[in-house]
From Swiss-Prot:
Sorted UniProt keywords: Amino-acid biosynthesis, ATP-binding, Cytoplasm, Glycosyltransferase, Histidine biosynthesis, Magnesium, Metal-binding, Nucleotide-binding, Transferase
MF terms (GO), sorted A to Z: ATP binding; ATP phosphoribosyltransferase activity; magnesium ion binding
Lipid metabolism keyword on record: no
Entry's localization field: Cytoplasm
Gene name in the database record: hisG
Disulfide cysteine pairs (residue numbers): none
Family annotation (InterPro entries): ATP-PRT_HisG_long, ATP_PRibTrfase_cat, ATP_PRibTrfase_HisG, HisG_C, N-reg_PII-like_a/b, N-reg_PII/ATP_PRibTrfase_C
Name recorded for this polypeptide: ATP phosphoribosyltransferase
C-alpha cells in the first residue's frame, strides 16, 4: 500500500488561499467533505491537514505532517523559541504572502536605532524572535508579549516601541509610529524536517516539488511575441528582460522582418514595450504562462 504524503496548511486567511491555489495549480484535486481538519486528494496520495498557522511547525517537527506551508515569520519565531522547530528547514520559497517584521517607535520620540531600546519595553507578537534580534546586538530590553493590536502599545504606555508585521505601513502611520529597523523579510515557505521520511512518499514529494517550482517560475515569467526588423534585431533582443535565447522565425512574404518569441524571466513593464516599439518592433504580445518545466 502506497504511503500518503501529509501537508499542513493554514485553515483560513491569506496563506490558506495561496497554499491551496499553489497545490491546485500543481494538479491536485481535493474532495471536500465534512471534516474541516483533513482533506484528501483524489488523484494523488496526498492528504492536507488544515490547522492554525502557528501550529504548522509543530505538526511538521513532530512528524504528524511531512511538509507544511507557513509564513517564514512563524517559522522564525518557533525556531527562536527552540524545540522541534529547530529540526525544520525551508524546502522551497513560494513567492506569495510577503511581509516584513519591523521595529517601530513613536514618530515624535527619541528611539531611532536598536541601541536606543536599551532599558526600554518592546511590545510584540513575536517575543522569541524579537528578544533574540535585540540581544544579538548587545542591547537589553524588556519584551512585552501581545497577541494583537500591538500598534497601540506605545499610545497606551504598555511599551516604548513595538516589533510587528508591516505591509503598507498605513497602520503604523495611523498610530503615530515610524519603522526604524527591519528584523525579517518574510514570505510563504514550504518546510520539512531535516531528517526527512524514508519511504515511498519521496517520489510524490519530488513530483510536487518539481511542479511547485514550475508554478512559481511561470508566475514570474512572461511569453513575449513580436515582429522585428532584421536590421534592428540585436537592439530588440537586448531589450527583452531576463530572456533566454529567443526563437527567431521567418515571416511569410517578408525578408526584412522576423518573428521573435521569448520567455522572459523578469517583469515586463509598459516602458519595456514602448522601448521595443521605438526600436521598430510591431505586433507585440505579452502572454502569461500557466505551466512551466525548465
Amino acid at each position: 500500500m502506497t504511503s500518503r504524503l501529509r501537508i499542513a496548511v493554514q485553515s483560513k486567511g491569506r496563506l490558506a488561499e495561496g497554499g491551496m491555489d499553489l497545490l491546485k495549480r500543481c494538479g491536485l484535486r481535493f474532495a471536500y467533505g465534512r471534516d474541516k481538519l483533513h482533506q484528501r486528494a483524489e488523484n494523488m496520495p496526498v492528504d492536507l491537514m488544515l490547522v492554525r498557522d502557528d501550529d504548522i511547525p509543530n505538526f511538521v517537527g513532530s512528524g504528524a505532517c511531512d511538509y507544511g506551508i507557513v509564513g517564514e515569520n512563524v517559522l522564525a519565531e518557533e525556531q527562536a523559541a527552540g524545540g522541534r522547530a529547530r529540526e525544520l528547514e525551508v524546502a522551497l520559497r513560494l513567492g506569495f504572502a510577503g511581509c516584513t517584521l519591523k521595529l517601530a517607535a513613536p514618530d515624535d520620540g527619541s528611539i531611532r536605532t536598536v541601541a536606543d531600546l536599551e532599558g526600554k519595553a518592546v511590545a510584540t507578537s513575536y517575543p522569541a524572535l524579537t528578544a533574540q534580534y535585540i540581544a544579538d546586538r548587545g542591547v537589553k530590553a524588556e519584551i512585552v508579549e501581545m497577541r494583537g493590536s500591538v500598534e497601540v502599545a506605545p499610545r497606551l504606555r504598555i511599551a516604548d516601541a513595538i516589533c510587528d508585521l508591516v505591509s503598507s505601513g498605513a497602520t503604523l502611520q495611523a498610530n503615530g509610529l515610524k519603522a526604524f529597523e527591519t528584523v525579517l523579510r518574510s514570505e510563504a515557505v514550504l518546510i520539512r524536517r531535516k531528517s526527512g521520511r524514508a519511504d515511498d512518499t519521496d517520489a510524490i514529494a519530488n513530483i510536487l516539488m518539481r511542479r511547485s517550482e514550475g508554478v512559481i517560475a511561470s508566475s514570474q515569467t512572461k511569453y513575449i511575441m513580436l515582429n522585428a526588423p532584421t536590421d534592428r534585431l540585436g537592439a530588440i533582443r537586448a531589450l527583452l528582460p531576463g530572456a533566454d535565447a529567443p526563437t527567431i522565425a521567418k515571416v511569410a512574404g517578408r525578408e526584412d522582418v522576423v518573428a521573435v518569441h521569448a520567455v522572459c524571466r523578469e517583469r515586463v513593464f509598459w516602458e519595456t514595450l514602448e522601448a521595443l516599439e521605438k526600436e521598430g518592433a510591431r505586433a507585440i504580445l505579452v502572454l502569461p504562462i500557466e505551466k512551466m518545466l525548465a
